[in-house]
């Protein structure tokens, strides 16, 4: 037996009032970003492609999958940031049925690239761009008018899984992955400024029962991510060549997320229902070696969600999702050499810490309708959703999305 699948997507959107970031994929590349004090609204276009193939023979299964993302983020007014991203992930997996379990293993590889620049059309409005290095620090030698750079990176990962072959039993998952991203300054013959390293481990162990009209699952999870950053020591230039004479590991970041998660589902005449929830502990600690800077926060959180699905006819189905969550701060701390910091950097760091230690409440809702063309495997769908986030610092965030698509 064999099967193939694929998907294609396009997204366009807008982010309002973005400051202290002129690079795309902030969550991935932070703190090694390009930044300025002015910022503004940014527009984004994203193209996604995904496809795979799997074959099964007896107790053995083999599959391969490719995921590609191309993204363009830009601003139409000064400072005119632009980021162009290509991101390719390849996955290979195999599984074998042995005893009462299916044992699986997978390999993953990723290649990432981004070109990033900032331009000014009004000469009188030019402001400096900072090559940020973490917790309010900058690579001052290459900040100012050096506004064109690019990122190259990627990595690899391995995962192991065990799942019961029958409807009831224990299951487990483990994953290790490593990635690194190099920031290079295109203005100066692509000299590498910094390199960011990711090391991550994920472990999950649980029990489930999926038989009959009731489904129950409960698992415990631990996610650990260690990030570290090297700053290159760059010598004097010779014929536009900048030698690397050393490096220092200056930035360190440790993230922990551990939680218990549960699911309960059932079917009835009014449709299929599912409730899910989790409670957990989240911790984030950042450190810059010298001059010493620290920022940390820890939170306890809970989330409760629900889903309802029903077929309204042979060709129309409706799905409704809702969820609520709260993150409450339990500890926080900051150490900064404020006497030696620029006023604008002080304001940025204080603002960041203010929201790092804040408590957050979240609500989300989504409704989706699927329509299958009569006598065909082709379907159409429409989806409308939104997220509302409020925090204890009296600020809030809204996210709305609308999706239209074809399934086949």
How would you name each of these model-derived features?
Residues 2-6, 58-64, 99-105, 166-172, ...:
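Outer-envelope beta-barrel architecture signal
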Residues 10-14, 55-59, 68-72, 98, ...:
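Transmembrane beta-strands of outer-membrane beta-barrel pores
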Residues 20-33, 106-152, 180-195, 234-241:
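Short, flexible helix-coil linker/hinge segments at the edges of structured domains or between repeats
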Residues 49-51, 90-92, 158-162, 203-205, ...:
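Membrane-embedded beta-strands of outer-membrane beta-barrel proteins
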Residues 55-57, 94-98, 162-166, 207-211, ...:
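Residue-level signature of outer-membrane beta-barrel architecture
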Residues 142-277:
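Long, internal scaffold/assembly segments composed of regular secondary structure
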Residues 396-408:
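Outer-membrane beta-barrel "beta-signal"
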